[in-house]
Amino acid sequence: MTKVEETIRNFRHFSSLLTLGTLDTFNFRHSIHFELLLLLALLPSLIGCKPTRPAADSQRSRTTPTPGSDAQPQFWVRVLLLNDATACTLDFASPFDVTCVTPDSNSQPQEEFFENLDAPPRPTWDSQRRGRGPVPVTVSAGKISIAGQPFDANEVTVCPKEPHVFTLNGSDYRGTLKLILDPNGGSFDAVNHIPLESYLAGVVGAEMPDYWEPQALKAQTIAARTYCLYIKKRFGADRAWDLSKTQAHQVYRGIDAESTQIWNAVNQTAGMVLVCKQAHPGPKGTPPEALGADAADDIFPAYYSSTCGGHTENSKNVFGDSFEPLAGVPCPYCQDVARPEFFFWPMTKLDAADVTEKLWQRYPRLKQLGQIMDITPAQQSDYGGFHRLTKIELSGTTGDSDFLRAEDLRLTLDPTGTKLKSTICQIAKSGDEWVFSFGRGYGHGVGMCQCGAQAMARQGKIADQILAYYYPNSHITRLY
């Protein structure tokens, strides 16, 4: 515990005792004055801040060799860092190699290898310019250029040597970086190839504060590992990357999210995933109970969100997939941990014309409705005292109507999810505005409730118990 945290704890402790009348005011007057003065002095630096790891810990993470570089190919992950980029900057802790895939005269891929391209060793990892400074990456005339050298290639892979770390636009990542030229030749995607366990160290610290309970961090790690491998298995074969770095999948911040606590959670759960009977959905619409008692164990998408608001949701109602561990459970825990403005979020008003425009852009078919005049619940989950919208009906000035999943509506109108925090809310038209009121919870609400996991860990529950609660009828197995 830092001195700042200790000061705040003592201040709260003294205040509560005085309120209860259990302390003699005179005897503790000077102590309280001291604590108050110190707290006031520190207040400007505390407002809006969260605890951060010491700089030394960050420095050590950047210079420590990347674990898992010898992992089997199925346990490497491809993370989309940039999409349709036209330029970026790279920097390195070490020399790097470049491998290119180019079409030959027969249009067959051919590798070309360039060693130590203009990259002397960088002895330090300070915040100043390292060695010769950042390396520019651009695209022009259908070619990707690195440090001014163009490559007639569809794919350019940059492989830093130990500690296998690179910096992309100021953020540090482990592994290698593949630059993939768009078919039109005017942009590129940047994809981070990284061992699974190193990837998780960049996810868990971004998805959950590293000062939370170790058992909550371990539960988060197992859920994130399971989710990653499921998405990779289901979608990775059809594209050049497995997951994006955003909340569309899992938030990934690379080395900036690492800390000793996070690596402890990753290392102590290495290879552990959640499985359930016949996790893959089977023929479309097949309910889990129809798959048979002899179905094999398999991974499933172990979704999770910040604050469920009191009950987790059935994945079928949000994402359209049906898995027995994702049917939804009551959650009496998260209100004890969640910030008040997350558990009960404030009324939000959106301009009606903007709502229509955003819906038209995202779903062109909705233009046939004209201006959106009515948004009504078509399906909702009732949890006694509150309900979560799962499907909504849109009606327009043309007299036509259409339907959307409520979660799709939420993220279309507020892609960051910071204003419309969940679909536990009421929607009404007021003049030229849409009003979202009585909001509750933060996120899609499927799978593990992160605040609930922290509350359970505070009560002494271990990671296995937390996961068994939020993903019933699943169990943990170790892949390696």
What does each model-identified segment do?
Residues 2-38, 44, 108, 122-127, ...:
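Intrinsic disorder/low-complexity segments
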Residues 38-42, 46-480:
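Conserved, single-site charged/polar hotspot
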